[in-house]
């Protein structure tokens, strides 16, 4: 099955055909670094990390570019509030970004360009637009003239008339059209600035991504991604700038956007003040669980945030980790191979079926939610095999390797515990070892009441004991 993805530009699923066979160029709009990123931003970051990983799994050579907006009105305002240099503040939050990104198991981008390192490229594009009559300068500001580009609005599906009717923009003497947007902003006292043909100033937000993506990926690159809130105006304006500068040449071939994360059915955003940063959530849940939660719903479907859903995600991840642990225990045991060839073949077939179903789900617009089902089915097959043949390695090695590999494609290390810290998992193992030892002593003394009490209380806590000829084993429900 060929890989198909939903292209926002065409509003339908399309077969993915890269610009260059075997290679993929991807660009996603990274954070504006004036604070820790919130879990709504985190969804976008995790989604496109997952997409990148799956493309790598399919054998593509992926160049993944994700920028940092390190100069912006919000950064300047935050710097003024804290009495700090805005560029230093942005650099500090870039460092904090990488800490939270590591917790979510985000692969570092191939290139992480910063806006302030690419001012010359932005100026070059603005000059080109001005030469073509697509931009105009007013007292040190430069604006893009949207009515000079007939295709403006093609990504969002809006006409210029509709935009003007719904615009919350006051028509001032400076703009020729209320929808015209800033390419370059004249410097205000106390703000960072760069020299330009229009005087001292700084770039507008939209020009930054156009310049950086074109520099590192060239025109017609494969995938441009971001959150659904960026379709308009940010991505619409990126297209206008880039394709205007390129004389109509295609800027990016596939546009992908994830749906909003909501709280009580209301979009999560910093502007609304109804957000949680990933840093805050990491105080209560590990990054693996947050990631598992974010990918448990198809990326184009809205996702409502609450603790209960995170707890369910933690249990789901623990189920997969338990399957790996049981497989490792069985593979590490000494004893006779008690499984027959048929049972081993059945487990190998389950592994092959899981791989097929996983690929089918992911090839259908990266349906990670459906891909989860293939992992859980394989986990169940491993558990059943280990229970029936506790000393057998027949087919188990392949099944274990397949489960681990497919989970890794989604960015999960099933050897890493889903609880708050590695030490917590080790302590659980140690406590269970002690309890099983106490229970074994009770059974040896024929103290069945104590033995059953331990078993029943553990069951109430979601821990199931199984008595086997080789001793008691425990699993998380």
Swiss-Prot record:
The record's free-text note on cofactor binding: Binds 1 zinc ion per subunit.
Main location: cytoplasm
Entry keyword Glycoprotein: no
Catalysed conversion reaction: tRNA(Cys) + L-cysteine + ATP = L-cysteinyl-tRNA(Cys) + AMP + diphosphate
Residues the record lists as binding Zn(2+): 29, 209, 234, 238
Gene3D superfamilies, alphabetized: Cysteine-tRNA ligase, C-terminal anti-codon recognition domain, HUPs
Pfam families (alphabetical): CysS_C, DALR_2, tRNA-synt_1e
Binding site for ATP: 270
Cellular component aspect of the GO annotation: cytosol
Enzyme Commission number(s) of this protein: 6.1.1.16
Source organism, top-level taxon: Bacteria
Residue numbers covered by motif 'HIGH' region: 31-41
Necessary cofactors: Zn(2+)
Protein family (similarity comment): Belongs to the class-I aminoacyl-tRNA synthetase family.
PANTHER family: CYSTEINE--TRNA LIGASE, CYTOPLASMIC, CYSTEINYL-TRNA SYNTHETASE
Protein name: Cysteine--tRNA ligase
Organism: Desulfitobacterium hafniense (strain Y51)
Biological classification of the source: Bacteria, Bacillati, Bacillota, Clostridia, Eubacteriales
